Regions:
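Cys/His-rich microdomains that often coordinate metals
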Residues: 19-22
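Histidine-anchored nucleotide/phosphate-binding helix
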Residues: 25, 53-62
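C-terminal folded domains that constitute the principal catalytic or ligand-binding module
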Residues: 207, 212-214, 219-287
Length: 287
């Protein structure tokens, strides 16, 4: 006896929701996304994309100046290459750090690519190539991220922007493959709760620079721990983005519209769960 194959549910190509739960028409200005002056870069866990309450889909439909990059777990190891922008290299040169020892030989910084390379495993990061940090201001052994960020090279990279590339390896015998390459512009700030974080909404002046780009980690807090060192929070991705953009002076009315869409999406999920529960209860009571 052949088993009947149920047809798959149709999904919306824009919001990735089932057609009967499509949210595209719920935006008050669904023909015109908000032209946010502060860019938003979302690093989304690969398993988060199809989650029913994934709110990045709302940000993608409602904000023009936005990029989303998929980030996966590290099962074996991954190598991160950080390429400094030209301005960073010039500032290091101006600080008389042109000649740095590399494998016992001198080289001119302007003639070399200024790259910081780190390998990340399940057990944490290891800097495998920090030759550009071996200068009179960077005397440390086996540096951690805080030490690298505190160095002149690290500070210049944060101030002037950089490009980071992730090369993933799934096993010892397998070759690397590029997962992403992201350009982090000057004025970028990570929207994430840490002990050293500046509280959003307290005072904009506390950042010490003009914020032009927000970097947001999208995933459950358990998944996000693998990307950073978090402290649990309670806001969704879209709620966090809206709050931050409002603090920096973006259009409040348009941003509130995004929150209304999110609330309606939560309502859909609650109704679907209730309906599923009722159907299960009904099937169990019927003879």
């Amino acid at each position: 006896m052949e088993q009947e194959i149920k047809p798959k549910r149709p999904f919306c190509a824009s919001c990735s929701k089932p057609m009967k739960l499509c949210i595209c028409s719920r935006f008050k200005s669904h023909h015109h996304s908000i032209n946010n002056s502060i860019a938003v870069t979302i690093l989304q866990h690969s398993q988060e994309k199809n989650h029913p309450l994934n709110s990045t889909r709302i940000a993608a439909l409602g904000l023009k100046n936005l990029q989303v990059f998929a980030v996966s777990d590290i099962h074996f190891d991954a190598r991160f290459e950080i390429q400094l922008n030209k301005r960073s290299r010039e500032e290091i040169s101006d600080a008389h750090l042109e000649r740095i020892q590399k494998n016992g030989e001198s080289f001119d910084l302007d003639e070399e690519e200024c790259v910081i390379s780190a390998t990340m495993t399940k057990f944490g990061p290891t800097f495998t190539d920090i030759s550009h940090l071996q200068c009179n201001q960077c005397h440390f052994k086996n540096p951690n991220f805080d030490e690298v960020l505190g160095s002149r090279v690290g500070q210049d990279a944060v101030s002037n922007g950089f490009v980071v590339k992730k090369l993933q390896r799934e096993g010892e015998e397998l070759s690397e493959h590029e997962e992403f390459e992201i350009s982090v512009p000057p004025g970028s700030a990570l929207l994430y709760p840490t002990k050293k974080a500046v509280a959003v909404g307290v005072r904009v002046e506390g950042f010490g620079f003009e914020v032009k780009n927000l970097i947001v980690l999208d995933g459950t807090w358990k998944k996000a721990k693998r990307v950073h060192q978090p402290k649990a929070g309670c806001l969704s991705t879209i709620e966090s983005i809206v709050l931050a953009l409002k603090v920096f002076g973006e259009d409040g009315d348009g941003l509130d519209d995004l929150l209304e869409v999110f609330k309606s999406m939560i309502g859909d999920q609650v109704r679907c769960k209730d309906e599923k529960f009722r159907n299960m209860k009904s099937s169990n009571t019927n003879p």
